[in-house]
A protein has these predicted regions:
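Stable alpha-helical structural segments in soluble proteins, enriched in small hydrophobic residues
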Residues: 37, 41-49, 87-94
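Catalytic beta-strand/loop module used to bind and position nucleotide/cofactor moieties
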Residues: 33, 37-40, 55-80
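Phosphate/pyrophosphate-binding loops at sites that engage ATP/ADP/AMP, CoA/4′-phosphopantetheine
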Residues: 16, 45-54
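Oxyanion/phosphate-interacting regions
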Residues: 79-150
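Structural motif
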Residues: 18-20, 54-56, 70-72, 88, ...
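Single conserved hydrophobic/aromatic residue that forms the stacking wall/gate
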Residues: 1-14
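Short, well-ordered junction/capping motifs at the entry into regular secondary structure
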Residues: 1-3, 73-79, 101
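C-terminal domain-closing interface element
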Residues: 18-44, 127-150
Length: 150
């Protein structure tokens, strides 16, 4: 909790640490699939750091292909590694902030309330107001929320 509040409240808490936030847009996820898009984002983040790390720890069972920095997968890494846990918090806080910005542009979707997660309310609002460019087509198709032929 202390780390989470610190990160939410002030970027100064992490000023002496190397980190990079990379957003991968829905069009990339739809084109490449969620796993490949995630791996590409991780590679961009690791290789885009101002400080080159000795080792990249990746939460999961695989590492990005062609990563030019030594990397090690850590299954359930967010529960066992402070570095991975901190990265997970940064990712969550960044995503939530992005949803808050989208909420200002699309208030009818109440993104500040459900943060874009597939809640009953969110699906009801999609039914009512339609699909916007920030939605992943691949996810909505799987859920039956994307018109055929689009």
């Amino acid at each position: 909790y202390e780390i989470a509040s610190c990160l939410v409240g002030s970027e100064m808490c992490i000023r002496d640490r190397a980190y990079k936030i990379v957003f991968v847009g829905p069009e990339i996820i739809d084109r490449d699939n969620i796993l490949n898009a995630t791996m590409s984002g991780m590679k961009q983040a690791a290789e885009g750091l101002d400080i080159v790390p000795n080792l990249v720890l990746v939460d999961g069972n695989r590492v990005p292909a062609a990563l030019e920095i030594p990397a090690q997968p850590v299954v359930k890494g967010d529960a066992t590694s402070a570095s991975i846990g901190a990265a997970s918090i940064l990712a969550k806080v960044s995503r939530d902030r992005y949803m808050m910005e989208l909420d200002k542009q699309y208030p009818q979707y109440q993104l500040a309330k459900h943060k874009g997660y597939p809640t009953k309310l969110h699906y009801e609002l999609i039914d009512q107001y339609g699909i916007q460019p920030f939605y992943r087509r691949s996810f909505l198709k799987k859920q039956g929320y994307w018109p055929e032929g689009k």
